[in-house]
Amino acid sequence: MIMLLMVGMLMAPCVGAHALDTPNPQELPPGLSKNINITFFNGVFKNVESVAEIFDCLGSHFTWLQAVFTNFPLLLQFVNSMRCVTGLCPRDFEDYGCACRFEMEGMPVDESDICCFQHRRCYEEAVEMDCLQDPAKLSADVDCTNKQITCESEDPCERLLCTCDKAAVECLAQSGINSSLNFLDASFCLPQTPETTSGKAATLLPRGIPEKPTDTSQIALSGEVAGEVRADTLTTLSRTKSVQDLQDTQASRTTSSPGSAEIIALAKGTTHSAGIKPLRLGVSSVDNGSQEAAGKACDRLAFVHLGDGDSMTAMLQLGEMLFCLTSHCPEEFETYGCYCGREGRGEPRDTLDRCCLSHHCCLEQMRQVGCLHGRRSQSSVVCEDHMAKCVGQSLCEKLLCACDQMAAECMASAFFNQSLKSPDGAECQGEPVSCEDGMLQGTLASSVDSSSEENSEEAPPQMERLRRFLEKPPGPLGARPLGGK
């Protein structure tokens, strides 16, 4: 059901569009609804013209939204609402302020940052009232023409979470963007005071909602929301075990265009510790070894994922996009960390490793709705000025393209730590991270690019900090020690 709703949001038809080529109901796994039709997908995403648009709006960095939302449908619903009502996209808020970034760094610094802070708190208090996110229930009604969001669900929890989102979008609509606050160094963020970190200091729920209700069915949700929010994001990615024949293709290189947000971010005086390099072409801190790799021909362009046993999946689109975005051969990524190019175990080692884990989970969700990466694909990759776009023909191909494109952009914008290439087996111990648990606890979300102080040891503490926002019951919102990005 999660993926059916995600499909609906991504692929809602435009006027005059052809019927959706949904999977044959007989091919769907047990438990998935066979009542799939056009009207099922009409709703809050009816004004989104394509899969590419919505993921382009998300941007290439994980931010504050990944810390708030635990599933694709609600995340994409919010992104569409924000885009529709405010004309803004999460990509406009990459590393914005102290609260709009993925990890809470300190007190908000402007009105938009306050929006993010209050949206976090609104969801945190909702969890305290046992109101958990249900991807099968999308209650927001978005009117793009009149730029209005309506929350009319009879379920109190649905309406509460919808109202939190409505407040956030309306807050952003009234707040301006201060571009100087993008990629703000965390050292400028002031730690939160005890008053602001206390869950009881000030409730941020919409007016009319009791702070500690004994019965969520009695929650009154009338009244306007006082919350304000600012958005930043990228979405969650994924991987698969299916088998596909290796395909050899050629790709032409183009000259680097140093205009992307990732390159700008790296150019803002950030220093990188030894062994860590950004993979974006055109960034001067790429070492000589990397330049040699970028200058040689690749043996193949498919990204190979080794599954359990002898199974192997050749992901041509992912490999081509990685090559386009970084000018590095896909095989350089295949043995990175605990999850890149393999069925991993333990906590992902860093941002790049988390991109691979997320890609695995994205493909796993596609598999559950009947879209298998191992099938012969008619998808193609367009590469121009180191910008890659995956173009699919059928609905499944478009969704699988979205998984691959998100993964490629996430991996390309992350730092490449040479010490994590082909890591010792002892570093990847324990149980594999469950996609289900990861989505619920936030372990699939990733912070934006690592700072100069980030190393291979930082992943476990990051997971703990993230659980402050997403575990039940959540701990108080606390600022991370200064010095991180």
From Swiss-Prot:
Q: What is its main location?
A: secreted
SUPFAM superfamilies per record: Phospholipase A2, PLA2
Sorted alphabetically, which Pfam families does this protein's record hold? Phospholip_A2_1
The ranges of region (Phospholipase A2-like 2) come to 315-371
Q: Which GO terms describe its cellular component?
A: extracellular matrix; extracellular region
Effect of deleting the gene: Otoconia show a strongly reduced matrix-calcium.
Residue ranges for the region (Disordered) are: 444-485
Residue segments, region Phospholipase A2-like 1: 75-189
What is the annotated role of this protein in its UniProt record? Major protein of the otoconia, a calcium carbonate structure in the saccule and utricle of the ear. Together with OTOL1, acts as a scaffold for otoconia biomineralization: sequesters calcium and forms interconnecting fibrils between otoconia that are incorporated into the calcium crystal structure. Together with OTOL1, modulates calcite crystal morphology and growth kinetics. It is unlikely that this protein has phospholipase A2 activity.
**Protein name listed in UniProt:** Otoconin-90
The organism's taxonomy opens as: Eukaryota, Metazoa, Chordata, Craniata, Vertebrata
The coding gene here is Oc90
